[in-house]
């Protein structure tokens, strides 16, 4: 089971640079505010919930607004405003992929196709599960040419947020394939999928990708430490050594 954004797709690279300023703009101020500490608090909230549905980040932000004596909006309203701002940021990327002006490889984490080809060649069933709304995940997976790997096995966030979680997808995968957790491989850059995979006995490959410098082969140290902290078995910056990674996964 793959996560999507930051694990395969870079179309939404820079999304924290949209969410964080929005939160800073909308958070009520208090007398003893220190802008640096407020920013650090909000960023920690955002990244701690990375991998869960976007609505959970909005629910946490609504709590912060209330804590400061503000009148919080419905978290869904915050989510819709965030998605509106993010769509402005990524619109040119989506349009350039749709028109053919950009090639999918420009917006795929380095080595993604090689890794997917290696796993597919072994006959493994590949699933995609994302905290991004499902229609966007399906749109962007197709733009990146990933549909042939995942088919209909693509899952994303729903407006009824209780009807989707990566834990639920994992449970469904195990049930439908009649396998135990030790047959599950989870690959992602968010702590949620790593933790959920480990909780059922799966193997977890964490992707501490530096999305802004794709192909540099450098770790995002914040991600690396956080993902190791929740039990990742392997941490990679990208998939430049896809064949070697698969050999390690299967115990060669």
Name every feature range the model reports, one short phrase each.
Residues 1-40:
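Active-site neighborhood of HAD-like aspartate-dependent phosphohydrolases
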Residues 1-2, 38, 43, 47-50, ...:
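Non-catalytic pre-domain segments flanking phosphatase-related domains
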Residues 7, 19, 103-107, 112-142, ...:
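Substrate-recognition element of Asp-dependent hydrolases with the DxDx(T/V) motif
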Residues 44-106, 110-121:
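A metal-dependent, Asp-based hydrolase signature
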Residues 76-77, 147-163:
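A short, structured active-site edge motif that brings together acidic residues
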Residues 130, 186-234:
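Acidic, Mg2+-coordinating phosphoryl-transfer loop and its flanking beta/alpha structural elements
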Residues 155, 233-239:
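Short acidic-hydrophobic, aromatic-tinged amphipathic segments that line or gate anion-handling sites
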Residues 164-197:
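Conserved Lys-Pro-Asp/Glu-containing loop-to-beta segment of HAD-superfamily phosphomonoesterases
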């Amino acid at each position: 089971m793959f996560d999507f954004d930051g694990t395969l797709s870079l179309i939404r690279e820079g999304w924290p640079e949209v969410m964080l300023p929005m939160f800073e703009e909308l958070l009520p101020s208090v007398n003893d505010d220190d802008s640096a500490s407020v920013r650090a608090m909000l960023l920690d909230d955002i990244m701690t919930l990375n991998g869960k549905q976007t609505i959970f980040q909005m629910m946490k932000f609504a709590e912060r607004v209330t804590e400061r004596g503000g009148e919080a909006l419905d978290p869904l309203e915050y989510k819709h405003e965030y998605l509106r701002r993010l769509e402005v940021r990524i619109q040119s990327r989506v349009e350039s992929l749709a028109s053919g002006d950009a090639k999918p490889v420009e917006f795929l984490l380095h080595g993604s196709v090689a890794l997917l080809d290696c796993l597919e060649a072994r006959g493994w069933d590949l699933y995609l599960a994302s905290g991004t709304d499902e229609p966007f995940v399906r749109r962007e997976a197709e733009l990146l040419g990933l549909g042939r790997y995942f088919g209909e096995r693509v899952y994303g966030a729903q407006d009824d947020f209780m009807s989707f979680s990566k834990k639920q997808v994992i449970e469904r995968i195990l049930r439908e394939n009649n396998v135990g957790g030790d047959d599950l491989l989870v690959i992602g850059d968010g702590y949620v999928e790593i933790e959920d995979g480990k909780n059922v006995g799966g193997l977890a490959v964490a992707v501490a990708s530096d999305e802004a410098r794709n192909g540099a082969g450098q770790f995002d140290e914040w991600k690396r430490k956080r993902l190791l902290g929740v039990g990742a078995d392997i941490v990679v910056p990208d998939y430049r050594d896809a064949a070697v990674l698969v050999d390690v996964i299967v115990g060669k």
